[in-house]
């Protein structure tokens, strides 16, 4: 069995509108015939917790898929460089929110290739529960998958 050296992590919460983008993308990826060296994880709203437990010496590349708010047109896909991630000076651990950016930067500094595929959301409904993606973001799921498949081949 080939070792898993590419990890695709979908982040978000399906209950809060477009925040569920990453979960929708990995749900589709899980049904695809991907190379044996690729592992797909739906990390939900706990992306950092999952990454901290899953990253080992075999991982060469991590692709994180998540909804973003960069003031773009809703449904716009943006490949985000590690240097563009928010500059949070320290980790802030609590029961619900662990910033992912510092952890991804640390992984990058350790030689792991980090790719973030973000989709500009339209409706982030938290704390109000509203399952389902907006039309614009739902249309962007396949485009994100296309980009991810390209990243796997690199």
Curated annotation (Swiss-Prot):
Key words, A-Z: Aspartyl protease, Hydrolase, Protease
Protein name (Swiss-Prot/TrEMBL): Putative hydrogenase maturation protease MJ0253
InterPro entries, A to Z: Pept_A31_F420-red_hyd_d, Pept_HybD-like_dom_sf, Peptidase_A31
SUPFAM superfamilies cross-referenced by the UniProt entry: HybD-like
UniProt record similarity statement: Belongs to the peptidase A31 family.
GO function term, MF aspect, one: endopeptidase activity
GO biological process: protein modification process; protein processing
EC number of this enzyme: 3.4.23.-
Pfam families in alphabetical order: HycI
């Amino acid at each position: 069995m080939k070792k898993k050296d590419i990890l695709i992590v979908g982040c978000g919460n399906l209950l809060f509108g477009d925040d569920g983008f990453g979960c929708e993308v990995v749900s589709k990826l899980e049904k695809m015939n991907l190379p044996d060296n690729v592992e797909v994880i739906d990390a939900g709203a706990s992306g950092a917790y999952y990454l901290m437990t899953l990253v080992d010496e075999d991982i060469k590349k991590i692709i994180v898929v998540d909804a973003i708010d960069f003031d773009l047109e809703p449904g716009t896909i943006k490949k985000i460089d590690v240097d563009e991630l928010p500059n949070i000076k320290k980790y802030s651990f609590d029961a619900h929110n662990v910033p992912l950016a510092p952890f991804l930067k640390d992984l990058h500094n350790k030689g792991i290739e980090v790719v973030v595929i973000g989709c500009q959301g339209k409706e982030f409904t938290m704390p109000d529960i509203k399952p389902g993606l907006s039309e614009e973001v739902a249309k962007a799921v396949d485009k994100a998958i296309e980009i991810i498949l390209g990243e796997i081949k690199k």
